[in-house]
Amino acid sequence: VVTSGVIDIAVGRKTPIAVSSISSKDIQLKGGNQEFPEIMNKVPGVYATKQGGGYGDSRISLRGFDQTNTSILINGQPVNDMENGRLYWSNWQGLTDVASGIQIQRGLGATKLAVPSVGGTISIFTKAVDKEKGGSISQMVGNDGYSKTVASYNSGKSESGWATSVLLSKWSGNGYINNTSGEGFNYFTAIGYAPEGSKHELNFSFLGAGQWHHQRDVWVSIRDYQNFGDEGIDTRWNSNGGSLNGEEFSMRRNFYNKPLATFNWDWEINSKLKLATSLYGSAGRGGGTGPR
């Protein structure tokens, strides 16, 4: 029910490129309360870290190249920042819930909608509209006050070919690093149309993650950690945080919501010719605070 004409997938023993794949089962198994890039840490050539420690502040390197030299795609659409090539994972917190697979292509590859990057290409595929009717509710708890609730529902494919999938989740936590609390919600919906015997397949998907979180600078010296730590070096110390009127306060606070909408149409004109059309758009609103 989901179209795939514009999604770049390397085929084993056919596509001449080093590639690794992560299944939906592995994503759910390794996800937990990790950052989404950390799921890829066991893949050869990949290095992911939480960086400052704030929710969504992680980064990933591929073949030693940072994210500005790595193409990152969601359902075939490039999501790197158009000005500097960076990717802010806090905008895509919900991928752990909705991703059905990840494929990492190391080195230059063939992509339809993104400029091939020297580091490689990370393709993330979201869940298709499920053909089976049903739903689920799950609750997750973790260290440092982390809590996450996920609810999903699939209408199942009707006799006329329509199907709908919806997922909502909410998370919050205090953060392992001092004064790095965060809270957010994730949303995803997909509507598919694929009648039996038809040569047309249509799919609309909409996903996003509204959030706010406190951050920690990464350029603080070891001397500062020694001076301000209670006993020796305090790895949880945060130069930006403290308390104000009895509540947590941070000079660096990030807040953003950047949904992505995609419409795909696949048309099998004949046995030798197929037309794949994709229309996508993304608009964000938010910002951040910090010392002058």
Segments (PLM) and residue ranges:
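Extracytoplasmic beta-strand/coil segments of soluble accessory domains associated
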Residues: 16, 37-78, 100
